[in-house]
Amino acid sequence: MASRKETPNGKTLDTPVKQIQIEGLVVMKIIKHYQEEGQGSEVVQGVLLGLVVEDQLEITNCFPFPQHTEDDADFDEVQYQMEMMRSLRHVNIDHLHVGWYQSTLYGSFVSRALLDSQFSYQHAIEESVVLIYDPIKTAQGSLCLKAYRLTPKLMEICKEKDFSSEGLKKASVGYEHMFEEVPIVIKNSHLINVLLWELEEKSTAADKHELLSLSSSSHLEKSLQMLMDRVDDMSQDIVKYNNYSRSLSKQQQQKHQYVQRRQQENAQRQSRGEPPLPEEDLTKMFKPPQPPPRMDTLLIASQINTYCQTIKEFTSQNLGKLFMAEALQGPSS
């Protein structure tokens, strides 16, 4: 589990993680893991190791989850993690569990599986984070590595397992209050920084002008297609909820009419001196329809928001490149 370093006055801080410092070696390991085992839409995952210093989470190492098929029924992930951390401890490497990482394609990572996994990690280890690595965006020239945590409000909802509309409304949980992004700082050794500086000095002007090349339109096309698919899913969920609301309203109306008829009958029987009708259990007679789960709808809305942000970043970068290219060409052209 993660461990907090004590402050100079001997007190342990319980403030939430506000920043993540990740070693460059860890970033390279994550990229290498996807290049070796990620095929097409295959998702790769692994464990993050490190420690917590005050309000900063330091990620110093990681190791991957091996890919296994249905034939590997005897594979135990928990046992595998324990063996790996025990081996790292023997060679004096940080072995404290601080989260996990996962690859994604086109930013499509918001799912119930990720929510359940991160809740399990964060419930057991308060400082846990999940790193999301997008290899497609990284291949276009900019490293796409983001860290997320579940918000305190969502953690409470998941603990209570109350995903009804009333529960979510009472807790004020919307799609924008599900995940919180934690800023990442990549730390390299002095030798690596010197090497990067030398590579920058050796790069030619032609190489630098390649940065103005527009990104592939296929990325935008795929993002828009996935956005449309999620909007269709949202539309279907809205239809299901509207049908539930109509069924509930119709049943409440029938229940109200039944109660009124019973009251009128009892009033007539009382006027004739007859005993009132026996009371009946209305909850058994009018069972309310099962409400559809709202958490899936929130996840879809959150994923739609992520796609919109991805498309916004993509288009803004290309527009910026167009303006810079126009400025470099000069007024004569």
Curated annotation (Swiss-Prot):
GO molecular-function terms, A-Z: metallopeptidase activity; translation initiation factor activity
Entry-linked CDD domains: MPN_eIF3h
Compartments, as annotated in UniProt: Cytoplasm
GO biological process, one term: translational initiation
Gene3D superfamilies in the cross-refs: Cytidine Deaminase, domain 2 (3.40.140.10)
GO (cellular component) term, any one: eukaryotic 43S preinitiation complex
Annotated Low complexity bias: 250-261
Domain named MPN: residues: 20-154
InterPro entries, A to Z: eIF3h, eIF3h_C, JAMM/MPN+_dom, JAMM_MPN+_peptidase_M67A, MPN
Chief localization: cytoplasm
Pfam families per record: eIF3h_C (PF19445), JAB (PF01398)
Keywords: Cytoplasm, Initiation factor, Protein biosynthesis
Family: Belongs to the eIF-3 subunit H family.
Main function: Component of the eukaryotic translation initiation factor 3 (eIF-3) complex, which is involved in protein synthesis of a specialized repertoire of mRNAs and, together with other initiation factors, stimulates binding of mRNA and methionyl-tRNAi to the 40S ribosome. The eIF-3 complex specifically targets and initiates translation of a subset of mRNAs involved in cell proliferation.
Subunit structure: Component of the eukaryotic translation initiation factor 3 (eIF-3) complex, which is composed of 13 subunits: eif3a, eif3b, eif3c, eif3d, eif3e, eif3f, eif3g, eif3h, eif3i, eif3j, eif3k, eif3l and eif3m.
Protein name as annotated: Eukaryotic translation initiation factor 3 subunit H-B
